[in-house]
Amino acid sequence: MSLLNTFIRYTKLSFLVLFSMCFSLSALAAEFTGRLSMHWNDKHHCTKHAQMFVDEVFEKSNGRLKIEVFHSGQLFGIREIMGGITSGAVDLGGVVGVVGFPKINKNFNVATIPGLFDSFEQQREFFQKSDKGQEIWGDLLNKTNSTLVMYNPVGPVMTFSGARELTGVDAMKDLKARRLIGAEEPMWKAYGAKIVGLKTSEVYTALQTGMIDTINTPPQSIRAYSWWEFLK
């Protein structure tokens, strides 16, 4: 089915749009309305980019193809969206690749290895042109019945903390760090930090109550979700 997938790297990330075979076949009708679900809120630039895509589709189809946008996890959250896509509950979805894809093919974790790829292009070429990458990507597409539509760059990932200035490895010890993906856990353990697994929708309250004080995320998310209030 459809995917709006985010490749997370510890230096940069980008996301791509996939849409379901079911959606493309249904679009053969004279008019069709599809549904796009994502966990990002309406202030997040990923949502704004997705809306630009939706507007372009509507224009290019002369109004025959309309996509309704459901942001902020109205339909599915960051961890639930794969189920919604696979079941056909939505036609397109915003999927964080390293959250959803390793459950389908564990070898997709190669996308999380810091420094392995020099650029977005090199990472994309691995999945599209190399034998092993094509094998991984083909398995994902076959099992989710989806196809790639576009890439949408997100930006760099940084570590933010409200506990103290992160001046070195010693400063990382005993931080209360949010973990989104499994690949983050070995890093935080090596630093001696306390680890708390949280969905995006749970981060604000966790920062507010002191459950966590540190997070890995793109700077744009800090602003979009008002996390900056606790990470100054």
Where are these regions (language model features)?
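Bacterial N-terminal signal peptides that target proteins for export
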Residues: 2-15
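Alpha-to-beta junction loops
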Residues: 63-65, 81-95, 193-195, 209-217
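Extracytoplasmic "Venus flytrap"
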Residues: 35-52, 72-76, 222
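Pocket-lining segment of extracytoplasmic ligand-binding domains
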Residues: 97, 183-185, 194-232
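Short, polar/charged alpha-helical segment
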Residues: 43-68, 182, 186
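Contiguous mixed-secondary-structure segments that line small-molecule binding/active-site clefts
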Residues: 54-55, 91, 96-196, 227-230
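Sec/Tat signal peptide C-region and signal peptidase I cleavage site
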Residues: 23-29
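Short helix-initiation/N-cap motifs at beta->coil->alpha
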Residues: 69-83, 165, 180-183, 195-209
